């Protein structure tokens, strides 16, 4: 495929962790040219000033967010802004013919009332929002193919739904028994300086936050309900791990049929994810380490049943900034453009 | 109290992490003299050779494990050996009049068949085992007072039972819904060199192990059943955190009475632990960080209810090597000797 | 000694890391009552709101910085404020009869022009500054005894001067060959949220900063010159270690007499620090780990000579927040009050 | 270039960290097929048993080390064995026509007596050793082109020599003033379980080792002497950083001409490394973070002069397992084969 077939891409919110992952991945993507880096506070800075390690590879300056200019230069736009901003920027971009992939929560919800009640923001872009597709390719690959607007999933929902989906879709569990105990590296908190994310505070410590009220709960429930065909409520508890990258979700649910054993579930999961190149189901008795997924777009799944309690326990590991964010967005881009789904997406971590 | 009233104490298995915590704590305990350090592989080494940072404080050499010699010199003996060794050493020591506090699993079980089936070791010390008291002072303070043999709890059971006990004792939850998602620093794996505990392997990673089959499960179930008054089964999943010290247990259960709210439970927990100086119940909406407990014998508890799911979620943080091991043993010693329960036990961490 | 003999102490700047160490140490000091916590941004907050883990131990509220009120209630005042503020607060406190221990750089310099040129602040408190004593007890114990104002040393200078002093004092090295390659945990950067101190940025990374221009250079040189009896210039390079606490200084210098061997220097160092209870000189061939000093007021020194190059290499490890800051201030207090130098100061770390 | 032009490669010592980096890099190298994984203790295991995260990518079993079989199947062989083994394996492989790249110390020394005295091993392969080229492409690119046997540099020497070479080659410093204060992540210690490399021991700590006697000293001196044209002695001190990957070398030396300023040296370094695609010289006042190099074959250099002391300070950051080991070996392979030097070698890290 020739140089001329590359598409022009803009990244808005390029100075954050989502942004720098997108820059990193798209810089090496064979069919993409990054032509616009946009930001608010960082406008005017060269990218090398913000991320000196990329000085040799990226020779761009952050520009102000000007939808007119963006649309005139970009075929595809990634939005990596804080929640509540994309819903103002995406509509004009779409109207001007851009494809938009939004990494915030703004376009993840079918029901904007759910969004508004959890994110404290009223919305007037209902028509645009209706066209958005939830960007989890393993579940919505077909819809993504023809979408113009992708609401990329949150990091916790990605890890959790990868673990839960086969169980819900096939009706194998009692949905109301679902408990998701999730743990994330601190990069999930973003690059803004917050005291509790300082190394001096977070290193050598582990704790929960947002117990019974984290905003990823309704997102997980929306997709879970879609898969189950009826409303599902889950218990979701996030924790911070003293490390940079990675999420592990430990998912518990009671099996509808206590006769199911691990081997059965391995078969079911393998079938469910047969066409999903980034899902790696671990053999009998192996559980994933988050580090195995670091720097890749992979999701590792480990599955266990407990005959003493009739429960299934699924362990799901991803890199929160790649499969949980920027990599998944690129995966969606590949699908939207009709390219190989794995194009430009790493599958081998650097271990250790 | 005069110098002459100090008791003479031996620590067997002094070269491991349990051992060095005991040495550290007892070295500063006002009523204890360490007179015997025993070990197998390390016999003949000075303590400063094993732990150079203590060279200025501890001038003792590890001696072979000779029960005759130990009993002749020690009134109290702490055993910090691998599982399956204490059951050979404790009986002669007790027969010779020593009080024994065992940090291994050997004397935690009322039912030795349970022990044998989970620890693959047959036992012939039934008479001795029958006299052992489970060394969790917050639950068995009275029994500990008059005990000669203490089976000190495991680190995970300590954290988990502190969270669960008020709920089970008062019949507030449906016991079979109990899920314990526990996380520990790697020092819980001991000081023996194992590949998966290398910094290069464990740092920057998080994963589960022993899913549905960890040996702390029957221990938690034994005490839970005792508290509930009937057999209780729990789901217990341990994980390794990339840090040295600390355990967080996240405990989930369905409330029998969905009308109970957080404030009710805070009241119930405060009453339950009223006479327990090491338990700190956090006010509304605060959840513990493991680091707060590091270097102390404290257990911090945070409590939440979820009206959406009728569940209670309790978060319990301890230092796995102190409240989860050596500190708790010293707490038991204090109670056995009729001393102030907090004697020689730190209550203020060095933060950050 | 009776309760009535306790002194009343205030801590200004109590919300920072220096402050919380002082609170932690003085809370357990047998002859001190903390009666005033002062702060600027944090005034009005309870201490438990800032540091929840101390909620059970410290029942005080941060008050505004009012020198009148402070002096009326406190015999001794610790100042833990950013550089450039103590020089406005100390003079009125001293005038009203308080003893003052300042943890900032304001009173470390004999020559205020040196201070002004490195800290960009003009000073008008020359008379007060002249009375200040540099609070490194191992070098200035006699002067500290009768001082009313202590300029507590910086963390890097403490570690570095402990390593260098015997060499300079005895004229054993060529001073101009001195190179100090120092490394610190990130808590040295304080509790204010700065991007480069986020766990996500600092974890898993190591780098230098302030090369050839760090403000601790003139401080080290002032004391080095005082010891050598002539002006000394040193090369000082600080680095950030991905961990919370601890400093290691690696100090290099060319020996004046190449015939000196390690054993000679061990003897010289032992004699030099004979009356210094917190200095621990490691035997032949042992080098300190920063973790050995964590949570203690100790300084571990390891010494090596290289006959191939005629250099001496000294390794010095401290806890930057204790011996490098708050603990050293308490050590000075003990000396000023005529108490045992080690009172209330921990000497045993929790290892691992 | 067609599939048929790929070369067949063997990796001996594939289970260690050097081995797994080679597997990782060569698996994605467009002109290489891995056809043989060899090992001693690990022979018979599948690679997925040793490194489960690679189960989906590498379908090979470790075979015994049989030079006959290796030579019959491989054109190029990488040796990643402990020191002292390659010197028995390389000669027969070379005799049978293989090109050999050895990651151990065995072929780094021109003078085998130096090797023998530092590595305690007598050698009988003098003829083979004479043909070996030191595999630091930035210095010996021409010699590597035609070599059959490469002695790949140690990790510390790589970082240190990248910093030192322009200074030595151009005679800009007084060589005897050179001090190299080097710091490494713990993966440099390999995958064998050693107590001091446990996370519980190494995390949260920093210390020196091998002071004045580390085996990388003669290696650095050999190349330094070669560059300077006369014998050079350096002071080299390694330290362990509590992190997995990365080396920072802080190099000090006195300038021959004190008039030289940073800008001069930036110009000189840029010229020296003009044809070296992996060397990135940072602009004025920027110093490298090791994390910038992680997962890449890059070496970042930061340069400072100190007019107060007439010294130059150079900071050099690499990934110890890539540019410091496996990546550099692949870089040599590319040069030996006449391929693009950067082929298959990552240049963009995943930050943070």
Swiss-Prot record, chains A, B, C, D:
The active site is at residue 155. SUPFAM superfamilies: Glyceraldehyde-3-phosphate dehydrogenase-like, C-terminal domain (SSF55347), NAD(P)-binding Rossmann-fold domains (SSF51735). GO terms for cellular component: cytoplasm. Gene3D superfamilies: Dihydrodipicolinate Reductase, domain 2, NAD(P)-binding Rossmann-like Domain. It is found in: Cytoplasm. Coiled coil: none annotated. Pathway: Amino-acid biosynthesis; L-arginine biosynthesis; N(2)-acetyl-L-ornithine from L-glutamate: step 3/4. GO terms for biological process: L-arginine biosynthetic process. It catalyses: N-acetyl-L-glutamate 5-semialdehyde + phosphate + NADP(+) = N-acetyl-L-glutamyl 5-phosphate + NADPH + H(+). Keywords: Amino-acid biosynthesis, Arginine biosynthesis, Cytoplasm, NADP, Oxidoreductase. PROSITE patterns: ARGC. CDD domains: AGPR_1_C (cd23934), AGPR_1_N (cd17895). GO terms for molecular function: N-acetyl-gamma-glutamyl-phosphate reductase activity; NAD binding; NADP+ binding. Its EC number is 1.2.1.38. It comes from the Bacteria. Belongs to the NAGSA dehydrogenase family. Type 1 subfamily. Catalyzes the NADPH-dependent reduction of N-acetyl-5-glutamyl phosphate to yield N-acetyl-L-glutamate 5-semialdehyde. This is N-acetyl-gamma-glutamyl-phosphate reductase.
